[in-house]
Amino acid sequence: SENQTMDDLCVLNYEDEILRPFGEKLMAEKKVQVMYFSSLRALKDGIYYQDGEIRIAKNGETELLARTDDLKLLGLHNFENVMVASAMALHAGVPMETVRKVIQEFAGVEHRIEYVCEKDGVAYYNDSKGTNPDAAIKGIQAMNRPTLLIGGGYDKQSTYEEWIQAFNGKVRFLVLIGDTKEKIAKAARSVGFNDIIMADNLKEAVQICHDKANAGDAVLLSPACASWDQFKSYEQRGELFKEYVRAL
């Protein structure tokens, strides 16, 4: 905010205990316009996510920006990104309808819970950047449908129990590929998850998911492993996943 003026906008997270009073100080000193966003509560002034809706509030009056079911992006962290980007665009004078259209059409950054397409009522997501269990946990947490999950790859000596426990009833089948498939299967069984299918390669895994999925399900590539056992990079793994999905 140091180089901003009252013509500018500073967008801050209302739930951050440091940023909230910082914003109040900026407003009191009339240094810059401040807009808060929140994913935990409705705001009287600001932009917030609640009950599947992103709303903009001014002086207690609210307007619906978008329902999150209409977004291709998934996950609370992405809804927060949408709120910040929308606040900045609206401040810059972009019409509400244009902002709404863009956020509904934006499919995300490549290989990061990237929406690929929907076939026969099944949505496909590419999270090839989920190269470790912590990153892959965010991938599964973002899913809002019963999910068939493709995991496995190069062994970076990770442990997988915490990732599998994060499935939290969402995962119908875990389809495993790569060097770690036996290690992950053992970890899964140790925490009570037994719906495991082994595949020889990514192409076969995609076909298995297609055959097992029901309309309303999601298929997610979020391997929790690096790609170097079968691929040059996570980017190549993600591109091949998309190619195999589109060829179904």
PLM features: residue spans?
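Acidic, Mg2+-coordinating active-site environments of NTP-dependent enzymes
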Residues: 1-123
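ATP-dependent carboxylate-amine ligase
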Residues: 88-96, 101-111, 115-248
